[in-house]
Amino acid sequence: MGNYRKLWFTLIGVLIVTFSLLGYYGAEVYRTAPPIPDKIATAGGEILYTHDSILDGQTAWQSVGGMQLGSIWGHGAYQAPDWTADWLHRELLNWLDVAAERAHGKPFADIDAAAQAVLRDLMKTEYRTNTYNPETGVAMVSSTRADAIAKTALYYDQLFSEAPALHKTREHFAMKENTLPSAERRAQMMGFFFWTAWAAATERPGTTATYTNNWPHEPLIGNKPTAENMVWSVMSVVVMMAGVGFLVWGWAFLRKHDEADPEPPQHDPLSRVPLTPSQRALGKYLFLIVALFSFQVLLGGFTAHYTVEGQQFYGIDVSQWFPYSLVRTWHIQSALFWIASGFLAAGLFLAPLINGGKDPAYQKLGVDILFWALVVVVVGSFAGNYLAIAQIMPPEWNFWLGHQGYEYVDLGRLW
């Protein structure tokens, strides 16, 4: 270790700094996360949503594919809309219509410009004002907003069911018919969508920006990029480019001597090393890797086709069995699996070479056990994805065995 002491200390120092930053900002994410109110209620005492119903709604959203079907707060697939941005915009338009009917007896589009400006200003104030009370856990909404929420929820209830009026919309969004069959779970999911929109519109205490830092862009309530958005967006690019430039400069000018071109060996060194039992056992890993890679490529074409025909494959309605959210899930997960399996196989192949051409104790047994563990994870997670999106799996099992809905971490938590 003596020759590499400086490098070891450099590596340890880098790890300490980076993991300290990761831990600090990871804790900050939880500390500054938007609160989930115990109740969303009106001044008249009507309870619209509760803490538990919002979380149940999140589970319902995860079970239909989560980020693989639209997105939340901008993180996910965009074949369907971002549900936060879409809900917020629709709710705002509904608020304007409800308020106009109450104040003027006609839709918002039919009142004069001065009256429209007054209602827009009232709406902006109402939506950006934080009515959440941390002591009681209650967030209050006006009766006008409650009616707007109900009208917005009705649209989503029809969208995620099989209402004929929204068939073309579902096709454009690559959603299967009756995406979420249970009316109760659809209502819960609406609560989750509302909460994400509430956080996107409500100002964080002590600031003039919302909990999501004024995301999404929504001119109706003044959601525009903050100064911090602009500064840190530019700074991140500048720092990245400066870092790359420093690395190039350091490599070119800080080295004490040029490295000599390596001389190729006369013979392939691997061909002179007899394979150990554990290395021979790695052959089945290659079949798994090739199978997953082929599966990923085929699913990539299948997924891309859904952008043309949202529910069909060359005229055949396959969405009831293999909807867009499922094949996109499998497409991404199969890529992660074959890449991870390839790294595992490479590392396991090199271990005996590093060990002087001999297998470490129980190496072959470990290779075999790990392979079957991979098979169980792949088959189990794919089956769980299917059963969740098909709404066959019980809701309470979805998180652990079905679909977590986080795009690159879709497999159930147990897997």
Language-model segments: residues:
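Short, charged/polar low-complexity linear motifs in solvent-exposed/disordered segments
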Residues: L88, D97-V98, L353-N355, Y362-K364
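Hydrophobic cores of alpha-helical transmembrane segments in multi-pass integral membrane proteins
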Residues: W8-A27, W61, L69, G206, ...
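Membrane-interface interhelical loops and short amphipathic "cap" helices
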Residues: Y30-H51, H75-Q79, W87, W95, ...
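Soluble extramembrane regions of membrane proteins in the secretory/endomembrane system
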Residues: R31-M230
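Short linear interaction motifs
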Residues: H51, Q62-G66, H267-P277, D317-Q320
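Post-cleavage N-terminal segment of exported redox proteins
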Residues: M1-T50
